[in-house]
From Swiss-Prot:
GO terms for molecular function: pore-forming activity. It is found in: Host membrane. SUPFAM superfamilies: Colicin, Colicin Ia, N-terminal domain. It comes from Escherichia coli. It holds the Pfam family Colicin. This is Colicin-Ib. One of its GO terms (cellular component) is host cell membrane. One of its GO terms (biological process) is killing of cells of another organism. Gene3D superfamilies: Colicin, Colicin Ia, domain 1. This colicin is a channel-forming colicin. This class of transmembrane toxins depolarize the cytoplasmic membrane, leading to dissipation of cellular energy. Colicins are polypeptide toxins produced by and active against E.coli and closely related bacteria. The chain crosses the membrane at residues 588-612. PROSITE patterns: CHANNEL_COLICIN. The gene is cib.
């Protein structure tokens, strides 16, 4: 866990936001609290923030500031305020984004409220109501979380404004009276910020209290094993929240990696320049001497015109050339650490400046020779200092490259960890989504069975009301017998059905059949498909349900033309795996809602019986009196 970052206010308790431990979240909520990175350190040493004794009445405590002091302070204040302004802008951007999320959260909460009202008004299942109640609690907590986040950003804004005023008060260009006025404004803004801190802290505490209630509610649901979808929804929402937070963190980590990579590139360029500078210094004549005096001796020579005037005997001008040569490491080191005079005396063993009667001339020549060594010494010292400075710059650059390399590694490791977390979240989400889909499938399956049972019961009731108890019992018995059975061949079915058809034609004429055909034209294809699916479920048909409205079309043609083979061929193709229950389900779905009358009922039931069990044809005959 990262260390809490705090807003430090003199004389007031601080409000701390822990970016991990206090992250505003609930079962499905991941609201990022404001990152209080503006005030993680103390104000500049020169700041009057928390130290209002810098003014002594109407006079400066210290001596009046110099122009240099004023300009230095101006630069410090400008740099400090620029930093605060950038952080304030970032804070405002975050607040704006939080405001957008709050608006979306309010809309989501209102939608959940309306959905819950609709479910309650419609007498929905208790599980669905429980699930929606839990969703509403989540939505309410999310909304409050964003309000808490915004309160934190508002507190940060006030703190920043306070520090800017304190910084303005520290200008050396204003009078003590003006400074005092600014400090009073800053103190007022600071007090407002502290009040905002308390408000945000109270809201955060309230948020945690509400979150605890929601967590407890979730635990109860999990413990009781009820409202499985509500539990899975909560787990899904939690992971989605983690995913959102992870995506933001990945974006920040990538930006961080890009930034440190650019810093590393800059550091490497600086190292290259430092190495080039060192090479350049070492390749100068004097630089070469510093590196290898044996290979590149250091030389210096000067032409002189020395005037001698003291002794008339030697009066005149002496023209000489002084020279100095360093061609080994020992002499070089000695010269660099001693004077030219010491070198001449101790290394060259030239201790006596006067060697002739011309004392004045000898001394001036000696001094010129000493000066030549000092001249060479200074050149070599300058070269050595430049090389040393370049080497120091290289060491510093290498250290910087090493630090930036480590920083890049840490940033890359952090990004990889977040990417790994992202994949883990994705995997968990996939698992949760699969479980949710399975729970919904189970719920839909249960609801479909309920609907199928109700539809079948309503169908039998309708048959009873329209055609009597015998017809209703016939439908029930045929449905029962068809379950788990296979249909006969088309030829066998036609043979059985022809007996019924021949008897039927003796009693009913073409006008009766045309009335049935007309009724079949009124079949609602959509309703038929829905009913077929439910009847199939009720009769235990587990194969793939195929919508075959064209079978009903063939039925209509057969009734009209009395040519039944095409119909039976189509009906056979309907029964996947030759399942008799599919044929029965189709027949019931055609008759439900279609005014086929007792004759149409008899024809359809006889056709199904011919395919399933022709013993029922006799019952159909009795039903219509043939």
């Amino acid at each position: 866990m990262s260390d809490p970052v705090r807003i430090t206010n003199p004389g007031a308790e601080s409000l701390g936001y822990d970016s991990d431990g206090h992250e505003i979240m609930a079962v499905d909520i991941y609201v990022n609290p404001p990152r209080v990175d503006v005030f993680h350190g103390t104000p500049p040493a020169w700041s009057s923030f928390g130290n209002k004794t810098i003014w002594g009445g109407n006079e400066w405590v210290d001596d009046s500031p110099t122009r240099s002091d004023i300009e230095k302070r101006d630069k410090e204040i400008t740099a400090y305020k620029n930093t605060l302004s950038a952080q304030q802008k970032e804070n405002e951007n975050k607040r704006t984004e939080a405001g957008k999320r709050l608006s979306a959260a309010i809309a989501a909460r209102e939608k959940d409220e309306n959905t819950l009202k609709t479910l309650r008004a419609g007498n929905a299942d208790a599980a669905d109501i429980t699930r929606q109640e839990f969703r509403l609690l989540q939505a309410e907590l999310r909304e409050y979380g964003f309000r808490t986040e915004i309160a934190g950003y508002d507190a940060l804004r006030l703190h920043t404004e306070s520090r800017m005023l304190f910084a303005d008060a520290d200008s050396l260009r204003i009078s003590p009276r003006e400074a005092r006025s600014l400090i009073e404004q800053a103190e007022k803004r600071q007090k407002d910020a502290q009040n905002a801190d308390k408000k945000a802290a109270d809201m955060l505490a309230e948020y945690e209290r509400r979150k605890g209630i929601l967590d407890t509610r979730l635990s109860e649901l999990e413990k009781n094993g009820g409202a499985a979808l509500a539990v899975l929804d909560a787990q899904q929402a939690r992971l989605l929240g983690q995913q959102t937070r992870n995506d933001r963190a990945i974006s920040e980590a990538r930006n961080k990696l890009s930034s440190v990579t650019e810093s590393l590139k800059t550091a490497r360029n600086a190292l290259t320049r430092a190495e080039q500078q060192l090479t350049q210094q070492k390749n100068t004549p004097d630089g070469k001497t510093i590196v290898s005096p044996e290979k590149f001796p250091g030389r210096s020579s000067t032409n002189h015109s020395i005037v001698v005037s003291g002794d008339p005997r030697f009066a005149g001008t002496i023209k000489i050339t002084t020279s100095a040569v360093i061609d080994n490491r020992a002499n070089l080191n000695y010269l660099l650490t001693h004077s030219g005079l010491d070198y001449k005396r101790n290394i060259l063993n030239d201790r006596n400046p006067v060697v002739t009667e011309d004392v004045e001339g000898d001394k001036k020549i000696y001094n010129a020779e000493v000066a030549e060594w000092d001249k060479l010494r200074q050149r070599l010292l300058d070269a050595r200092n430049k090389i040393t400075s370049a080497e120091s710059a290289i060491n510093s650059a290498r250290n910087n490259v090493s630090a930036r390399t480590n920083e890049q590694k840490h940033a890359n490791d952090a990004l990889n960890a977040l990417l790994k977390e992202k994949e883990n979240i994705r995997s968990q989400l996939a698992d949760i989504n699969q479980k949710i889909a399975e729970e919904k499938r189970k719920r839909d399956e249960i609801n479909m069975v309920k609907d199928a049972i109700k539809l079948t019961s309503d169908f039998y009731r309708t048959i009873y009301d329209e055609f009597g108890k015998q017809a209703s019992e016939l439908a029930k018995e045929l449905a029962s017998v068809s379950q788990g059975k296979q249909i006969k061949s088309v030829d066998d079915a036609l043979n059985a059905f022809d007996k019924f058809r021949n008897n039927l034609n003796k009693k009913y004429n073409i006008q009766d059949r045309m009335a049935i055909s007309k009724a079949l034209e009124a079949i609602n294809q959509v309703h038929m498909a829905e009913n077929f699916k439910l009847f199939s479920k009720a009769f235990g048909f587990t194969g793939k349900v195929i919508e075959r409205y064209d079978v009903a079309v063939e039925l209509q043609k057969a009734v009209k033309t009395d040519n039944w083979r095409p119909f039976f061929v189509k009906l056979e193709s309907l029964a996947a795996g030759r399942a008799a229950s599919a044929v029965t389900a189709w027949a019931f779905s055609v008759m439900l809602g279609t005014p086929v009358g007792i004759l149409g009922f008899a024809i359809i039931m006889a056709a199904v019986s011919a395919l399933v069990n022709d013993k029922f044809i006799e019952q159909v005959n009795k039903l219509i009196g043939i």
